[in-house]
Amino acid sequence: MKKEVIVGSRDSALALWQTNWVVERLSKIHPEINFKIVTMKTKGDKILDVALAKIGDKGLFTKELEHALLNKTIDMAVHSMKDLPTVLPEGLKIGAFCEREYPGDVFISPKGFKFLELPQGARIGTSSLRRIAQILAVRPDLQAIPLRGNLPTRFRKMEEMDLDGIILAYAGVKRLGYEDKITEMLSFDLCLPAVGQGSIGVEIRADDTFIEELLKPIDHFATNRAIRAERAFLKRLEGGCQIPIGAYSEVKENRLHLKGVVASLDGKLVIKGEKEGSIEEPEKVGISLAEELLTKGAQKILEEIRRDANE
């Protein structure tokens, strides 16, 4: 009889696509194992009428899966890397960083507008503070309209609310087959992605060497190094979804290149920077860029946002 490995997943269409993607690869590599998917709803799936920044809870899309891991009811949990907090619960770790899809954002306009050609005061659907701050930095006249839910829900709301456009992660749009709706790919100069965007991560128990070995073939070297740098950058800034922070790292010619941004909520102050370093020291690259941005003015932005959040 085949050994069974239980894989935990959120129950959204995108989460299941990603979990099936992981399981298909693992099943080919380990045909002697039966991988069984178990789904569950997270707090972030249940609260859809409030912006994530207002809920203000880390691990909104991961906690239930992490509890199942720690309770040993599942053997691994598949996440969007951008949902995984930089500090994991004690006893858990990331077992694999799967090869990254293009991590950028896309602009979708039912009216066919290119982003920079939007009319004055155009209404753009997004609840992401990172996206709002970066688009306001370029177009302060735009109105950001809160928009949450799965992709079909967002497309429906876009039409119902007569929005001029919405901003989404390319990876999710592609994975669910909505590429034909894309009006424009947003450049990194305009909008740096969320930390980990475009990559699927597999979380495991830190002491489970059997599962760790199973995952090694799907841990993608360049993605592993890039996202570790981004996560170290975010962790040093102590940023969650309440703070507009973007980052993108890639391996080029055996060196790690990292771009980062911290912005005020209104987009009036934007602190950007870049860092290059050794692929063997991704955390060092991330921390170094974070500290550089803190001295360039990011510290002031972070303090103001945290003070306002506590009032």
From Swiss-Prot:
Q: Does the keyword NAD apply?
A: no
Any GO BP: protoporphyrinogen IX biosynthetic process
Single GO cellular component term: cytoplasm
Instruction: Give the record's keywords alphabetically.
Output: Porphyrin biosynthesis, Transferase
EC number(s)? 2.5.1.61
Q: Which SUPFAM superfamilies match?
A: Periplasmic binding protein-like II, Porphobilinogen deaminase (hydroxymethylbilane synthase), C-terminal domain
Protein name from the UniProt record: Porphobilinogen deaminase
Taxonomic source organism: Carboxydothermus hydrogenoformans (strain ATCC BAA-161 / DSM 6008 / Z-2901)
Highest lineage ranks of the organism?
A: Bacteria, Bacillati, Bacillota, Clostridia, Thermoanaerobacterales
User: Which gene holds the coding sequence for this protein?
Assistant: hemC
